[in-house]
Swiss-Prot record:
CTP binds at residues 8, 11, 91, 141, 144. A single active site specifically recognizes both ATP and CTP and is responsible for their addition. Signal peptide: none annotated. Residues 230-331 form the HD domain. Belongs to the tRNA nucleotidyltransferase/poly(A) polymerase family. Bacterial CCA-adding enzyme type 1 subfamily. It comes from Paracidovorax citrulli (strain AAC00-1). CDD domains: HDc (cd00077), NT_ClassII-CCAase (cd05398). This is Multifunctional CCA protein. Pfam families: HD (PF01966), PolyA_pol (PF01743), PolyA_pol_RNAbd (PF12627). Catalyzes the addition and repair of the essential 3'-terminal CCA sequence in tRNAs without using a nucleic acid template. Adds these three nucleotides in the order of C, C, and A to the tRNA nucleotide-73, using CTP and ATP as substrates and producing inorganic pyrophosphate. tRNA 3'-terminal CCA addition is required both for tRNA processing and repair. Also involved in tRNA surveillance by mediating tandem CCA addition to generate a CCACCA at the 3' terminus of unstable tRNAs. While stable tRNAs receive only 3'-terminal CCA, unstable tRNAs are marked with CCACCA and rapidly degraded. ATP binds at residues 8, 11, 91, 141, 144. It catalyses: a tRNA precursor + 2 CTP + ATP = a tRNA with a 3' CCA end + 3 diphosphate; a tRNA with a 3' CCA end + 2 CTP + ATP = a tRNA with a 3' CCACCA end + 3 diphosphate. Magnesium is required for nucleotidyltransferase activity. Keywords: ATP-binding, Hydrolase, Magnesium, Metal-binding, Multifunctional enzyme, Nickel, Nucleotide-binding, Nucleotidyltransferase, RNA repair, RNA-binding, Transferase, tRNA processing. The gene is cca.
């Protein structure tokens, strides 16, 4: 029985990056061999075990053979005679198909049958063998790695193979949950726009997210958007979210906030009147199709519907600000509203020449929210009921009280913040 550290841990060590997770492959063993040594079986689709002390994953060396379309159509062989080279050959990229012999990190003996170290030096994302085409999830993984390794490029032959897979309908067969899983991971990388540029380049974006793909080539008014192209703008917004270390919900909202601009009638371009509601409608379809988690879905919906009003909030008086807070459900969900405002800041700064421009709307609305939440709604309701108010009338009393509190807060602000 031989044990090898494989995959991302080897790659990251060669790159001088921190190694957070280590994966291991065991050659020449059976499930019974590992169980006898105290390893705990956890794999459902193929034999994976947890080390009895480190709890790291150890998998039996395996081969895979395509048996159908999509992500799940595989026959797996984990016989003891499967070699390390055979196991590495099924991996997606050469930089992920390297191994180190043994469990002692000091005894560094690299096994690199497919030129992964060479491609690391050349900063290339290259597929290992033609078996790459057997798993369409690899299209998403390559795009995600492009977002992580920002100075790497996709090898031309790998991009060509990905296009062939898309043309053959493989991308359309992907399981929605897996598509979302990979997109979510890509959104959290250093340069998430690169993921979508790669997906667009191979044609997969038009299959997986056609609502997003159609934004490229759609013009916006140059006085507000010097970058003009809506697709370019959305990628700038997304990268601004990464620059500001935004959480996943904000990054997803940044990605999908302008979907409605892709359906603007050609005869009114470059104006996009009413695109906010169209964006929200398209977003609902995307979230249903990809089964996007509720937190991401709700944050993105508020951003899609209200980002224009939030941008213009400096023009609003106290009563209108309270109505905006209510539409955003900010009084009940202040933490989510903070995420909404961060996404709107990314939108405003994700424009050519506006990257360093302050966004005072964010602090102004957070201040207005704090003032509105300071109102003792129970006391206001009691006064209203004492004067004969009931039902919606009580709500109006509370709304007016919040407006008064916001007005008082605005009056106390310096002119730049309160007007």
């Amino acid at each position: 029985m031989q044990i090898y550290m494989v995959g991302g841990a080897v790659r990251d060590r060669l790159l001088g990056r921190p190694v957070n997770d280590r994966d291991w492959v065991v050659v020449g063993a059976t499930p019974d061999d590992l169980a006898a040594r105290g390893f705990l079986p956890v794999g459902r689709d193929f034999p994976v075990f947890l080390h009895p002390e480190t709890r790291e994953e150890y998998a039996l060396a395996r081969t895979e053979r395509k048996s159908g379309r999509g992500y799940r159509g595989f026959v797996v062989d984990t016989a003891p005679d499967v070699t390390l080279e055979q196991d590495l050959s099924r991996r997606d990229l050469t930089i992920n198909a390297m191994a180190v012999r043994g469990e002692d990190p000091a005894a560094w003996e690299l096994v690199d049958p497919y030129g992964g170290a060479r491609d690391l030096q050349a900063k290339l994302l290259r597929h290992v063998t033609d078996a790459f085409r057997e798993d369409p999830v690899r299209i998403l993984r390559v795009a995600r790695f492009a977002a992580r390794f920002t100075d790497f490029s996709v090898a031309p032959e790998t991009m060509a193979l990905m296009r062939e897979m898309v043309d053959a309908g493989e991308a359309a067969d992907l399981v929605p949950e897996r598509v979302w899983q990979e997109i979510a991971r890509g959104l959290m990388e250093a340069a998430p726009s690169r993921m979508f540029e790669v997906l667009r380049g191979c044609g997969a974006l038009a299959v997986l997210l056609p609502e997003l793909d159609r934004l490229w080539g759609v013009p916006q008014r140059a006085e507000y958007h010097p970058e003009v192209d809506t697709g370019v703008h959305v990628m700038m917004v997304l990268d601004m979210a990464a620059r500001l270390h935004a959480p996943l919900a904000v990054r997803f909202a940044s990605l999908v906030h302008d979907l409605g601009k892709g359906t603007t009638p050609a005869d009114v371009l470059p104006r996009h009147i009413g695109h906010e509601q169209r964006s929200a409608t398209l977003l609902a379809d995307v979230c249903e199709r990809l089964r996007v988690p509720v937190e991401c879905r709700e944050t993105a919906d508020v951003v899609a519907r209200e980002h224009g009003n939030i941008h213009r909030s400096a023009e609003l008086g106290a009563a209108a600000l309270v109505r905006l807070l209510e539409r955003c459900d900010a009084l009940r969900k202040p933490a989510r509203f903070a995420d909404v405002l961060l996404a709107c800041e990314c939108d405003a700064r994700g424009r050519l020449g506006f990257e360093e421009t302050p966004y005072p709307q964010r602090q102004r609305l957070l201040g207005a929210l704090q003032a509105a939440r300071s109102v003792d709604t129970a006391a206001v309701a009691a006064r209203a009921q004492a004067r004969g108010a009931a039902g919606p009338q009580v709500g109006e009393w509370i709304r007016r009280a919040r407006g008064d509190a916001v007005q008082e807060w605005m009056a106390a602000q310096p002119p730049a913040a309160g007007t």
